[in-house]
Structures are given as C-alpha cells and as structure tokens.
Design a protein with these regions (language model features):
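Core SAM-dependent methyltransferase catalytic element
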Residues: 125-130
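Conserved acetyl-CoA-binding loop-helix of GNAT-fold acetyltransferases
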Residues: 72-86
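Short amphipathic alpha-helix that is part of the acyltransferase structural core
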Residues: 1-28
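Conserved GNAT acetyl-CoA-binding A-motif
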Residues: 85-98
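Conserved active-site alpha-helix within GNAT-family acetyltransferase domains
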Residues: 95-123
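A conserved beta-strand-loop-helix scaffold within acyl/acetyltransferase catalytic domains
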Residues: 28-59, 63-64
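A short, internal acetyl-CoA/4′-phosphopantetheine-binding micro-motif in the GNAT/acyltransferase core
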Residues: 63-72
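Hydrophobic, well-ordered beta-alpha structural blocks that scaffold small-molecule cofactor pockets
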Residues: 30, 79-83, 102-104
C-alpha cells in the first residue's frame, strides 16, 4: 500500500470513528487504529478539569509526534491537526520537543496551557479558542 493510500485510509477511518461514536475514548482505543498507531502517531484520550472551568474538557492526546520518515513529507501531522480542528477536538501533546509545533497549533486557533511535571517533562494541552 502506498503512503498516500495509507494516509487516505487513516483519515477515512478517523472520520468514520468520530462521526459514529463522538466518544474520544472509544475512538482512541479503536482496534482498527493499531496499524496506524505504529505507522503514524500514538494517541489516547483524556478528560481534564481546567482551572476555573465549569465542565470537563475532552482531549485527544498525541504521545509521539515523530513520524516515520516516509510519512514526514506527506504532511500527515498537518492534515491530522486540520482534521481535528474542523471536528472541534481539543489536543493534548505529550513531550513537546520544538517551538514550531506551538506556533503551528496557535495559528490554527488553539490556546496552549503548558504543564511541567516533577521530572521536568513538558506536556501541553491545546484547547480550541472559543468562537466569538
């Protein structure tokens, strides 16, 4: 299967999963994603109480932002973020490794809240900015 075919299959499954379930836990743990987790990116789901918020917010957690070489030039991560943005899904990125990712997500309309644990690891939750 060619890279473009794999990417197209991934997004078709992603859209179907989100449209049919609207449940990030079920989506992130869908066994059909096992192949793509190895090829593209590792993800999970989490609900987070944001300080001052009245409700829980749901985030898709992206654990590994390093893609295999054959997929880097195909724009997989950019396409995934665009897709999640269109679906209104918040993102939690574990282990931030470069500022370009911050800038990219900020430009897409996400507001960052940075967290550092006791070991010094940085993770960042990106909540979609409220539309006026």
């Amino acid at each position: 299967m060619k890279v473009d075919d794999k990417i197209s299959s991934f997004f078709a499954l992603l859209k179907l999963s989100i449209d049919s379930q609207k449940d990030l836990y079920a989506f992130a743990n869908n066994p059909d994603f096992a192949l793509f987790k190895k090829l593209f990116i590792s993800f999970d789901a989490r609900e987070v109480k944001i300080e001052g918020a009245k409700q829980l917010h749901y985030f898709l957690i992206i654990h590994d932002i390093e893609l295999h070489a054959e997929f880097k030039s195909a724009g997989v991560f950019t396409r995934m973020i665009d897709f999640l943005n269109e679906q209104g899904i918040n993102i939690w990125v574990d282990d931030i490794v470069n500022n370009r990712l911050f800038e990219f997500l900020h430009n897409k309309g996400y507001k960052a809240s940075i967290h550092k644990n006791r070991m010094g690891w940085i993770s960042c939750m990106f909540k979609l900015a409220e539309k006026p």
